[in-house]
Amino acid sequence: MDLIEKLAAIEEIKALKARYWRGVDSKDLELLRSVFADEDCEIDMRNPTGPGTGGAVVHDPDAFSKNCLRALADYTTAHHGHNPEIDILSPTEATGNWPMEDRLWLIDGAKGVGFEYLHGWGNYHDRYRKTDKGWKISFTNLQRSRVDKR
Protein backbone atom coordinates (compact mmCIF):
# COMPACT_ATOMS: atom_id res chain seq x y z
CA MET A 1 0.00 0.00 0.00
CA ASP A 2 1.24 3.46 -0.77
CA LEU A 3 0.93 6.37 1.66
CA ILE A 4 -2.36 7.65 0.18
CA GLU A 5 -3.95 4.18 0.45
CA LYS A 6 -2.78 3.86 4.07
CA LEU A 7 -4.12 7.30 4.98
CA ALA A 8 -7.45 6.47 3.30
CA ALA A 9 -7.64 3.21 5.28
CA ILE A 10 -6.91 5.07 8.54
CA GLU A 11 -9.73 7.54 7.84
CA GLU A 12 -12.13 4.67 7.03
CA ILE A 13 -11.22 2.98 10.33
CA LYS A 14 -11.74 6.23 12.25
CA ALA A 15 -15.21 6.52 10.71
CA LEU A 16 -15.91 2.87 11.58
CA LYS A 17 -15.10 3.43 15.25
CA ALA A 18 -17.19 6.62 15.29
CA ARG A 19 -20.14 4.56 14.00
CA TYR A 20 -19.54 2.07 16.83
CA TRP A 21 -19.91 4.78 19.47
CA ARG A 22 -22.83 6.41 17.64
CA GLY A 23 -24.57 3.03 17.47
CA VAL A 24 -24.16 2.60 21.23
CA ASP A 25 -25.23 6.14 22.16
CA SER A 26 -28.19 6.27 19.77
CA LYS A 27 -29.21 2.71 20.74
CA ASP A 28 -29.19 1.79 17.03
CA LEU A 29 -28.94 -2.00 16.90
CA GLU A 30 -28.47 -2.23 13.13
CA LEU A 31 -25.72 0.40 13.11
CA LEU A 32 -23.91 -1.15 16.08
CA ARG A 33 -24.02 -4.64 14.57
CA SER A 34 -22.79 -3.35 11.20
CA VAL A 35 -19.36 -2.35 12.51
CA PHE A 36 -18.32 -5.92 13.40
CA ALA A 37 -16.88 -8.61 11.16
CA ASP A 38 -19.32 -11.41 10.41
CA GLU A 39 -16.73 -14.16 10.97
CA ASP A 40 -13.89 -14.66 13.44
CA CYS A 41 -14.93 -11.76 15.65
CA GLU A 42 -14.01 -11.43 19.34
CA ILE A 43 -15.47 -8.78 21.63
CA ASP A 44 -13.73 -8.74 25.02
CA MET A 45 -15.82 -6.72 27.45
CA ARG A 46 -14.72 -8.20 30.76
CA ASN A 47 -15.12 -5.62 33.52
CA PRO A 48 -17.04 -3.15 31.33
CA THR A 49 -17.78 -0.72 34.15
CA GLY A 50 -14.65 -1.26 36.22
CA PRO A 51 -12.74 -4.09 37.94
CA GLY A 52 -14.88 -6.95 39.19
CA THR A 53 -18.01 -5.93 37.27
CA GLY A 54 -18.45 -9.07 35.20
CA GLY A 55 -18.80 -8.91 31.48
CA ALA A 56 -17.65 -11.54 29.03
CA VAL A 57 -15.70 -12.42 25.93
CA VAL A 58 -18.21 -12.79 23.10
CA HIS A 59 -17.70 -14.27 19.64
CA ASP A 60 -21.20 -13.46 18.37
CA PRO A 61 -21.57 -9.83 17.25
CA ASP A 62 -25.36 -10.18 17.04
CA ALA A 63 -25.61 -11.29 20.67
CA PHE A 64 -23.11 -8.66 21.84
CA SER A 65 -24.96 -5.84 20.09
CA LYS A 66 -28.33 -6.86 21.54
CA ASN A 67 -26.96 -7.41 25.06
CA CYS A 68 -24.99 -4.15 25.02
CA LEU A 69 -28.03 -2.08 24.10
CA ARG A 70 -30.21 -4.01 26.56
CA ALA A 71 -27.75 -3.23 29.39
CA LEU A 72 -27.67 0.46 28.44
CA ALA A 73 -31.41 0.85 27.81
CA ASP A 74 -31.99 2.71 31.10
CA TYR A 75 -29.13 5.15 30.50
CA THR A 76 -28.37 8.20 28.44
CA THR A 77 -24.81 7.60 27.25
CA ALA A 78 -21.99 9.62 25.72
CA HIS A 79 -18.90 7.81 24.41
CA HIS A 80 -15.87 9.56 22.95
CA GLY A 81 -12.64 8.26 21.44
CA HIS A 82 -9.57 10.45 21.14
CA ASN A 83 -6.22 10.50 19.33
CA PRO A 84 -6.22 6.98 17.88
CA GLU A 85 -3.02 5.17 17.03
CA ILE A 86 -3.86 3.12 13.94
CA ASP A 87 -1.33 0.84 12.26
CA ILE A 88 -2.06 -0.57 8.83
CA LEU A 89 -0.42 -4.01 8.84
CA SER A 90 -1.48 -5.06 5.34
CA PRO A 91 -4.13 -4.10 2.78
CA THR A 92 -6.65 -6.13 4.81
CA GLU A 93 -5.44 -5.92 8.44
CA ALA A 94 -4.94 -3.10 10.92
CA THR A 95 -4.73 -2.46 14.65
CA GLY A 96 -5.87 0.49 16.70
CA ASN A 97 -5.56 1.90 20.19
CA TRP A 98 -8.21 4.44 21.18
CA PRO A 99 -8.07 6.41 24.43
CA MET A 100 -11.69 6.81 25.45
CA GLU A 101 -14.01 8.52 27.88
CA ASP A 102 -17.65 7.78 28.54
CA ARG A 103 -20.49 8.94 30.74
CA LEU A 104 -23.72 7.19 31.59
CA TRP A 105 -26.69 8.82 33.31
CA LEU A 106 -29.62 6.82 34.64
CA ILE A 107 -32.89 7.93 33.04
CA ASP A 108 -35.36 9.25 35.65
CA GLY A 109 -37.50 6.45 37.03
CA ALA A 110 -35.45 3.66 35.44
CA LYS A 111 -33.92 0.75 37.36
CA GLY A 112 -30.51 0.56 35.69
CA VAL A 113 -27.84 -2.01 36.48
CA GLY A 114 -26.57 -0.88 39.87
CA PHE A 115 -25.45 2.71 39.45
CA GLU A 116 -27.02 6.10 38.71
CA TYR A 117 -24.01 7.71 37.06
CA LEU A 118 -20.73 6.52 35.57
CA HIS A 119 -17.76 8.49 34.26
CA GLY A 120 -15.07 6.24 32.83
CA TRP A 121 -11.74 6.38 31.07
CA GLY A 122 -9.65 3.76 29.37
CA ASN A 123 -8.44 2.40 26.07
CA TYR A 124 -9.96 0.27 23.35
CA HIS A 125 -7.49 -2.13 21.76
CA ASP A 126 -8.85 -3.15 18.36
CA ARG A 127 -8.02 -5.24 15.33
CA TYR A 128 -9.67 -4.54 12.00
CA ARG A 129 -10.20 -6.60 8.87
CA LYS A 130 -11.08 -5.29 5.44
CA THR A 131 -13.96 -7.27 3.96
CA ASP A 132 -16.07 -6.93 0.85
CA LYS A 133 -18.23 -4.60 3.01
CA GLY A 134 -15.29 -2.38 3.99
CA TRP A 135 -13.27 -2.24 7.21
CA LYS A 136 -14.83 -4.11 10.16
CA ILE A 137 -13.87 -4.64 13.80
CA SER A 138 -12.58 -8.21 14.20
CA PHE A 139 -11.42 -7.81 17.82
CA THR A 140 -12.06 -5.20 20.47
CA ASN A 141 -11.10 -5.03 24.13
CA LEU A 142 -11.93 -2.23 26.55
CA GLN A 143 -9.33 -1.74 29.29
CA ARG A 144 -10.56 0.65 31.95
CA SER A 145 -8.02 2.89 33.68
CA ARG A 146 -10.51 4.65 35.96
CA VAL A 147 -14.22 4.55 36.71
CA ASP A 148 -16.13 6.94 38.96
CA LYS A 149 -19.70 5.93 39.69
CA ARG A 150 -22.43 6.43 42.17
Please identify what each model-predicted range represents.
Residues 1-26, 30-38:
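Short, low-complexity N-terminal intrinsically disordered segments enriched in polar/charged residues
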Residues 3, 7, 55-58, 115:
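Charge-dense, low-complexity intrinsically disordered segments
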Residues 4, 73-150:
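A beta-strand edge to alpha-helix "cap/lid" segment located at domain peripheries
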Residues 11, 47, 146:
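Solvent-exposed, flexible loop/coil residues
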Residues 29-102:
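A solvent-exposed, acidic/Ser-Thr-rich amphipathic alpha-helical stretch
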